[in-house]
Amino acid sequence: MRKFLIFAFAAVMLAACNKPNEKMNNDLITRIAEIEVNDGYLEEYLAAAHNVGTKSVESEPGVICIFPMQVKDAPNTIRILEIYRNEEAYQTHLQTPHFLEYKQGTLHMVKSLQLVATEPLAPEAMPLIFKKY
């Protein structure tokens, strides 16, 4: 009887682990923005990046994450993790007043910008990491 219970428990756990996450979204857009800030504009740029990231996540349902980070050994290098629910959410984000203000207000501060498309390796962890997912 004990072996049967262990087997039954293992079967239930295996089924639970293999159950697809109903919230899993194959339409996610994930990328890392790599930004080099011109000398003399770092503090101003950091404030603008913080502001647009916070406003976007707070006010846009399709924005899961905008997380600016500064490279420790290269302070003028900024990386921003961006996650959008889908293409429509991304396009909507590009038209918001807070994004347009950020974009226009920082054009002269940015030396270079590269958007690197990424593919999540553990999408099942998204609900554990991001409250909005």
Where are the language model's segments positioned?
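Short, well-ordered beta-strand segments in beta-rich or mixed alpha/beta enzyme
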Residues: 28-36, 65-94, 132
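Short amphipathic alpha-helical segments
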Residues: 41-63
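Glycine-rich beta-strand-turn "strand-cap" elements at beta-sheet edges
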Residues: 18-30, 67-74, 103-133
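Sec-dependent N-terminal signal peptides
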Residues: 4-12
